[in-house]
Amino acid sequence: MTSDDSSQKQTQEHSHKQDFQYSYPLPIYYLTRFFDKINGLVKLADKFETLLLRPKLSEVRIDRPIYITGLARAGTTITLEMLSNHPDVGNHKYIHIPMTYLPFLWQSFALKVNVFTERAERIHQDGIIVNRDSPEALEEVFWQRRFSNVMDESKSNIMDGLIDDDEFLRFYKTHIKKLLFAQHKTRYLTKNNYNVTRIEYIKRVIPDARFLIIVRNPINHLASTIKQSKLFKKMSKNNERLEVLTQIIGHREFGPNRVCINVDNTPTINYIRELWKNDPNDVEAWAIYWNSIYEYVKNVLETNEKVASSTLVVNYEDLCDNSEEIIDKIIDHTGLSKRRFRKVKKIYAKKLRKPKYYKPEFGDEDIQTIK
């Protein structure tokens, strides 16, 4: 069998997999929805957990937390997965989905229950295998609860260094400490695509934060994004659970409920929406959106020296093609121990490859639009 035949077979197999009806485990769905509806009581439980752990938390230090961000499908998840295997790193996991606010008490309870222990391909059907111990992006639960504009694409979502919210900051830092304590780790790691407009704010309130901004070739990136959006739209039609759960945990990048990130460019967002009305997969719309986000990031890095010095821009293609070199740069930038990451580095140097289960299907006109 030739490599082309093999690739075609993989593509066909992946296409057939897309016909299945994805479902989160029912206990996770119902618990997540229940706790979302009683959020006031959940916040009281959070305060109780904090009080319970207060003597221990005084000994926990937030040291150079690592923030992975960039547009969805850029390679942020595989970067999260890789770094989460560092023995010093603590992060949110699938096990935290129902009760993200209680990283210690909920984890202590959930680990005793035999739910979601089997490994399976995640909802995105992109070859990433997960179970309850796998890293997951859950921070948006807090941001969207506290700040009303973060999921409102008609308003600027930029949080710069001028914003003050002492109450949220106390909660946020305490939560990080509780998560690190619960996992016996020293370095906090998080992935949140929506944090791309908050890097200036995060840098101001956590001065030693480290940022990894993942960038991908726009042709492949948009092909992956459009494919994913089609998939989510298809799955959401007959799966209310998927739609509800992704809204609760703040995963709104794809499908009928996707929310654009507004970088103080409402007219541009409106234009994108007009294009999507005619065609939800309009290449021009996605290209404009991609450019607006990374142009904003470029401007921040050029005008904010403090943020720039704390940021490493990682090209996804370089990460796949020159894995060892780029992994070393990531570890150097984050300040994680290279020695304690050697085995993981070897594994991911072999594992990191550009996706083969699909290929961009753009015509010449589409490619020119993207360029």
Where on the chain are the PLM-derived regions?
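PAPS-dependent sulfotransferases, especially Golgi type II membrane carbohydrate sulfotransferases
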Residues: 1-59, 226, 233-371
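Pre-Walker A (Motif I) flank of P-loop NTPase domains
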Residues: 62-65
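Hydrophobic anchor at the beta1->P-loop junction of P-loop NTPases
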Residues: 68
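P-loop (Walker A) phosphate-binding loop of NTP-binding proteins
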Residues: 71
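A conserved segment at the C-terminal end of the G1
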Residues: 77-90
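PAPS-dependent sulfation machinery
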Residues: 95-188
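Short catalytic-loop micro-motif centered on adjacent basic/acidic residues
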Residues: 187-191, 313-315
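Conserved phosphate-donor/acceptor-positioning beta-strand/loop module used by diverse small-molecule
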Residues: 191-193, 202-227, 330
